[in-house]
């Protein structure tokens, strides 16, 4: 199966390209990036493919079966929709798009073409996450009535001044970058409950002005001190669903002592704390005593599993849990979070 990677930045080089190279069924024919040097570097590094700068050239090639869209968020919907209409199967990095309306257009194109459109919500391929989903479905926690989500860092604004902190490119800040992963886990494990109301507030203090931002290291750096930082570096709020009430606190940068990256699933019979990217602990009772069970599970290569599953579903026609139809539920909720924060009022859905 011949594939192409559109967008040859950090996530493509760290995950998508190596995963395709490790999959015996796939051959990368094109590396595409508007910055030619990036595409050429990929050809040189991986010893395969052709470097191009226009994704339309990729889509015009009938030999291409599938593409990974790893561009900045602003290009996701345009490229994914064009690829679907050109008869290609698509794995689009998260978030699906900058805006809920764009994600809906992507879903519409998928329904019209019948091609695969999966979103890069990679935690749905995490063994720990799937075990939590299983435990909740089995009733181990009883009624899960509350979920608390924390994705807070002391100093982690990525590439400040660049694409990540430019609203016109990214669509938002920490919520659309980190929050999308955490909320996707919550929705997936809790059976995709419908959102009823959302109340949120967002903050942008530590990244403005850019020249005053103090840090020790920076992912996706170096900083562009003459660039733009017009997105939130912090956000908090509450969501009512027809399942649990979800409260959350997220920040790229916050004056706290330690990073806090976890999700608490709180039920009537038990509770689970998932440390993001690590293991989880189940708190319950048995024989009149409080219990604490630590689950230490195999750490899978989630991106490899994601790519392998994408390739397999193209061949089998099986619908994956990362399909656009499931992701659109989270996209709608996140849209309401931003609307609430922008308008300083509760949003009723």
For each predicted feature, which ranges?
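N-terminal Rossmann-like dinucleotide-binding module
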Residues: 1-46
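Active-site loop of classical SDR/Rossmann-like NAD(P)-dependent oxidoreductases
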Residues: 11, 274, 296-308
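Predominantly a Rossmann-like dinucleotide-binding segment in NAD(P)-dependent oxidoreductases
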Residues: 11, 123-226, 344
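Hydrophobic residues in well-ordered beta-strands that form the structural core
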Residues: 12, 92, 117-119, 248, ...
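Conserved SAM-binding strand-loop segment of SAM-dependent methyltransferases
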Residues: 48-55
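Beta-strand-loop-alpha-helix segment that lines the small-molecule cofactor/substrate pocket
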Residues: 65-66, 72-73, 77-124, 139
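C-terminal helix-rich "cap/oligomerization" subdomain common to oxidoreductases
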Residues: 66-69, 112-115, 287, 295, ...
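Contiguous beta-strand/loop segments that form the cofactor/metal-binding neighborhood of enzyme cores
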Residues: 184-279, 307-318
């Amino acid at each position: 199966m011949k594939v192409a990677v559109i967008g040859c930045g950090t996530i493509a080089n760290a995950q998508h390209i190596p995963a395709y190279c490790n999959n015996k069924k796939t051959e990368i024919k094109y590396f595409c990036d508007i910055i030619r040097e990036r595409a050429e570097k990929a050809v040189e590094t991986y010893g395969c493919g052709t470097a191009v700068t226009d994704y339309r050239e990729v889509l015009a090639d009938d030999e291409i079966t599938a593409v990974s869209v790893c561009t900045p968020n602003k290009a996701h919907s345009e490229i994914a929709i064009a690829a679907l209409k050109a008869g290609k199967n698509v794995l689009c990095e998260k978030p699906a798009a900058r805006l809920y309306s764009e994600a809906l257009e992507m879903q519409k194109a998928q329904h019209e073409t019948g091609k695969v459109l999966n979103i890069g919500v990679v935690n749905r391929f995490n063994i720990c996450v799937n075990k939590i989903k299983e435990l909740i479905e089995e009733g181990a926690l009883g009624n899960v009535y509350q979920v608390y989500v924390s994705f807070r860092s002391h100093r982690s604004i990525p590439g400040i001044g660049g694409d990540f902190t430019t609203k016109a490119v990214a669509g938002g800040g920490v919520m659309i970058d980190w929050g999308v992963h955490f909320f996707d886990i919550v929705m997936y494990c809790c059976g995709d409950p419908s959102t009823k109301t959302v109340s949120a507030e967002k903050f942008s203090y530590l990244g403005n002005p850019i020249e005053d931002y103090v840090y020790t290291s920076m992912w996706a750096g170096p900083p562009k001190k003459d660039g733009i930082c017009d997105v939130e570096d912090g956000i908090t709020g509450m969501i009512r669903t027809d399942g649990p009430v979800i409260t959350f606190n997220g920040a790229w940068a916050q004056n706290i002592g330690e990073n806090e990256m976890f999700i608490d699933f709180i039920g009537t019979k038990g509770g689970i704390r998932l440390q993001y990217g690590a293991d989880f602990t189940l708190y319950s009772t048995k024989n009149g005593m409080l219990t604490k069970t630590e689950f230490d599970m195999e750490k899978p290569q989630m991106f490899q599993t994601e790519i392998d599953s994408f390739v397999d579903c193209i061949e089998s026609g099986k619908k994956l849990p990362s399909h656009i139809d499931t992701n659109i539920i989270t996209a709608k909720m996140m849209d309401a979070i931003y609307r609430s924060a922008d308008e300083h009022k509760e949003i009723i859905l």
